[in-house]
UniProtKB/Swiss-Prot annotation:
Keywords: Chaperone, Cytoplasm, Cytoskeleton, Leucine-rich repeat, Repeat. Residues 24-68 form the CAP-Gly domain. Supercomplex made of cofactors A to E. Cofactors A and D function by capturing and stabilizing tubulin in a quasi-native conformation. Cofactor E binds to the cofactor D-tubulin complex; interaction with cofactor C then causes the release of tubulin polypeptides that are committed to the native state. InterPro entries: CAP-Gly_dom_sf, CAP-Gly_domain, Leu-rich_rpt, Leu-rich_rpt_typical-subtyp, LRR_dom_sf, Ubiquitin-like_domsf, Ubl_TBCE. The gene is tbce. It is found in: Cytoplasm; Cytoplasm, Cytoskeleton. LRR repeats lie at residues 147-168, 173-194, 199-220, 224-245, 247-268, 271-292, 301-322. It comes from Danio rerio. The lineage of its organism: Eukaryota, Metazoa, Chordata, Craniata, Vertebrata. This is Tubulin-specific chaperone E.
Length: 521
């Protein structure tokens, strides 16, 4: 390659990748220099200026530096990288004989392994960080790897979408393409390259310094893409996709600082089923097209929503999510909202009760027993507030005010499902404090009346397994299988079974002053 063609090319130097922005002299030194803007600004020294003279421009004040051409690698073509990556493996794996203690041992079946490992038969090719920068001789890719369906070119030296298209147009079966950690210059005519990506279904372009405007500009190249991964880019606001991205079922926008008022711009994508908005600084989302308790027309197909590591701090945001008509999976970990409750398990139960269609929360399945327990507990927890707001156990008198229904849009549905809680079951949410978490529990052994009752103060968050461990020590019954039930003053004639060792006491609505009955065989 001639150096006068180097501007815009990608280079690698000591493991760091960058883009050539200048070629020429840098007085007072002799010879030719490359002015490089590095992907990682900490690798650079300046912004493209030296001794008061500007040679090129960088986005970061320390993103640039000068290197000698002989120290920079401009990469290799696809087929060269393929041979370097795979033929070495084949030579290592497919030797038909190996020497052990001076004897020759024949490796039976290695001919089949060799055939399987043949480059031409590959359907998946991984060339991550192999310094691929060009397609190579005409049609050589098509002749070398004709059956490739999945290709990983992450972290290479591809300089433009045109160069990439020269590779992919030779891969007629390509459906999955990984391009993360590349810096591709944006094509001026993206539609003209669409034939090179006509079969593409999955595209990963994480960490490529792209804006949403650039994504929409490039989108005509890949009209058939169903899964698009755009994590850790420069996406700060969203615009409504017009005539592009309409086939998307999966969209990952995580690790982008997105203006939350623009999130609804993608709510009209008709097939979008999975959306990742984790680590986007999101604190609010509102579907104003419908009131509380109704289903929105936005995000009509959305089944899975990831909101981890955001700034969500109010339950009203969860109420808004209940408006999504198809939502069955939510991940909302590490948000301030979760710390407003006594513990994470309590927050989980409230979230389950507020989201009636949910089947999976934070990667844990919601079983029918857990949902029932969560919804019953929710009814008790907010029953007093319901009564104060105008609620009544008699249906014709039940008319809670608008404020309550806005804050608890599922409450009427739940009391229709389970019945209104009895007055003795109502309990207020108490402030988060250790003393409010401790329950005074009396342990009784009904089948061994010689044992005296034992009174203990335990946190409601204590799981049943640990309670049993405590009882093994207190009762001096190591290794014995314990069966627990409990009674309360409100239902003194009824025993409620505690049958899941991994649930906390509060899951069973065990309250201060209740009695736990201990049996063993």
């Amino acid at each position: 390659m001639m150096l006068d063609e180097a501007v815009g090319r990608r280079v690698c130097c000591d493991g760091e990748r960058g883009t050539v922005r200048y070629v020429g002299p840098v007085p007072p030194t002799a010879g030719v220099w490359l002015g490089v803007e590095w992907d990682h600004p900490e690798r650079g020294k300046h912004d493209g200026s030296h001794d008061g003279v500007r040679y090129f421009t960088c986005r970061h004040p320390t993103g640039g530096s000068f290197v000698r051409p002989q120290k920079a690698s401009f990469g290799v073509d696809y087929v060269t990288a393929l041979k370097q990556r795979y033929e070495v493996e084949i030579e290592e794996v497919t030797a038909e004989e190996m020497k052990i203690s001076s004897k020759t041992v024949v490796m039976v079946g290695f001919e089949n392994v060799k055939k399987k490992q043949s480059v031409k038969n590959l359907t998946e090719v991984g060339l991550r960080r192999c310094e691929v920068s060009a397609p190579g001789p005409e049609n050589e890719i098509r002749n070398t790897t004709p059956f490739v369906q999945s290709l990983d070119l992450s972290g290479n030296l591809l300089s433009s979408w045109e160069v990439l298209a020269a590779i992919t147009e030779q891969l007629d079966s390509l459906q999955e393409l990984h391009l993360s950690h590349n810096r591709l210059s944006i094509s001026s005519a993206p539609s003209s390259l669409s034939s090179a990506f006509s079969h593409l279904r999955v595209l990963s372009i994480n960490s490529c310094a792209l804006t949403w405007t650039q994504v929409l500009h490039c989108a005509p190249m890949w009209q058939q893409v169903e899964e698009l991964y755009l994590a850790d880019n420069n996406i700060t606001e969203l615009l409504r996709p017009e005539h592009v991205l309409q086939a998307l079922t999966v969209l990952d926008l995580s690790n982008n600082q997105i203006a939350q008022e623009t999130v609804l711009e993608i709510s009209h994508l008709p097939r979008l089923e999975r959306l990742n908005l984790s680590s986007t600084s999101l604190s609010e989302i509102k579907f104003s097209d419908v009131p509380a308790g109704k289903k929105t027309t936005l995000f009509p197909a959305l089944k899975e929503l990831l909101l981890d590591d955001n700034n969500i701090s109010e339950w009203r945001v969860v109420n808004e999510l209940e408006k999504l008509p198809s939502l069955v999976y939510l991940s909302c970990r590490r948000n301030p909202l979760l710390h407003k409750e006594k513990n994470l398990e309590t927050a989980r139960q409230i979230m389950i009760a507020r989201l009636g269609q949910l089947e999976l929360l934070d990667m844990r399945q919601i079983l029918s027993d857990e949902r029932r327990g969560a919804e019953l507990d929710y009814c008790k927890m907010f029953g007093s507030a319901w009564l104060r707001a105008g609620g009544h156990r008699e249906a014709e008198k039940n008319n809670p005010n608008t404020d309550f229904m806005t804050e608890h849009p599922r409450y009427l549905t739940l009391i229709q499902k389970y019945g209104a809680p009895d007055e003795g079951e109502l309990r207020e949410q108490k402030p988060f404090a250790l003393k409010n978490q401790l329950l005074t529990i009396t342990f009784l052994c009904p089948e061994d009346l010689e044992r005296k009752p034992i009174e203990k103060k335990l946190p409601g968050s204590m799981i049943v397994q640990k309670v049993k461990g405590l009882l093994h020590r207190l009762l001096k019954l190591p290794g014995v299988e314990l069966k627990l039930t409990y009674t309360c003053a409100k239902m003194a004639d009824r025993e409620i079974e505690i049958d899941n060792d991994l649930k906390p006491l509060q899951f069973y609505s065990v309250e201060d002053g209740d009695k736990i009955l201990v049996r063993w065989s």
